[in-house]
Amino acid sequence: MIRQLVSGLVVAGLVANAGAARAWDPTVERQAQAAIAEFKKADPSIEAFFDEAYGYAIFPEITKGGFGIGGAGGDGAVFEQGVAVGSSHMSQVTIGLQAGGQTYREAIFFKDKAALDGFKRGDFELAAGASAVAVKNGASKAAGYERGVAIFTMALGGLMFEASVGGQEFTFEPR
């Protein structure tokens, strides 16, 4: 009962915050730069994505939790040709068999200007079936873009069992 109550409160907080645009925060950019260094340290082959992508969004810490109904959320920085151009908020609501909580990083690479512009306009949502590559040494060598986007995640902590459905939604706020 207590676990369900705590999970419900976490989900309610995440959902209430889901569509909130975030003002530019230099702390998030610093955290994103540190996350970029950690991605590269964990898998040096990911450097090619940072070098060749037109832009990318880096979410240094996404928190996810649930028990039956779940949610996730986190703030990140958006870069265009290596320069920070704005901030983003990711939110997700999931329904299905799930229990636990975890934190992770997420990097979304945009192959070209059109893909990044779609993200900035709000025309971007990761569907439930979108695939992300878990960053580990050499994993990004075999990864590629799908519809102009490549997604990588890096676990930070926690344990989550899930067989659930839910997509990620993003907001963008220019710098």
Model-found features: residue ranges?
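Bacterial N-terminal signal peptides
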Residues: 6-17
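Positively charged n-region of N-terminal signal peptides that target proteins for export
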Residues: 1-4
